[in-house]
Amino acid sequence: MAVNLRGVTTVLLAGTGSDDDYVYRAFSGPLHDAGAIVVTPEPQPSRLIAGYLAALDDAARSGAPIAVGGVSIGAAVSTAWALRHPSRAVAVLAALPAWTGEPGNAPAALTARHSARQLREEGLAATVAAMQAGSPPWLAAELTRSWLAQWPDLPDAMAEAAAYVAPTVEELATLTVPMGLAAAVDDPVHPADVAVEWAAAARHAALHTVTLDEMGADPSRLGAACVAALLEL
């Protein structure tokens, strides 16, 4: 199922608390190499999911099919959009999917709920300091920048993302377009097992992996893994 992204508008959605700056750096190089037109909407923390869906709808308004994807919650929302609009999507790029179906006690959902509660109870400065103390330096720097920019609506975005119902295994089995997946083998918040489950469920999917150290040294390693998985189909 060959995929050609040349000239295709490709919309990438950021993860919860992350931003369009990071997702652009992660995906733009590999996608430009493939000839794609890269669009990375700025998250709207006061209406995270609705804002993402509106951005996808806007990109598809010209009538030309688009490629969609993102990181974590961005991967889930874009995949759900592709499932609802099979004639408007040509491919999905799903990096670090966090859970399948109901969020339940998935690590990313628990982390987002905890951070939202801490932000509301202790404030931004204390929560950022705690995040920095428990994160690799590269991730702490990324999230410090994006969290500051998304305050004071950040806890609302985190709570909304933590309640989001991702595509189920049964729904993924109905995905008609090819899907390239990327997982970090040592990421405790986005377990690689979730990406493996998505890849097994979808009809036309491939999975490539990276490590957190590789992502920290060069964000484009994540996007490159995702694009390479898609292009091998």
Residue ranges and their predicted role:
Residues A2-R47:
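Conserved HGGG/HGGXW glycine-rich cap/lid loop of the alpha/beta-hydrolase fold
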Residues H32, L48-I66:
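Conserved acidic catalytic loop of the alpha/beta-hydrolase fold
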Residues G70-S78:
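Gly/Ala-rich beta-loop-alpha elbow adjacent to hydrolase catalytic centers
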Residues L96-R145:
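Helix-rich cap/lid subdomain of alpha/beta-hydrolase
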Residues A141-E170:
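Hydrophobic, aromatic-rich cap/lid helix
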Residues L175, L181-A183:
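Short beta-strand/loop motif that positions the catalytic acidic residue
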Residues P188-V194:
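Conserved alpha/beta-hydrolase "acid-adjacent" motif
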Residues H204-L233:
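Catalytic active-site module of serine/aspartate enzymes centered on a nucleophile-bearing elbow/loop
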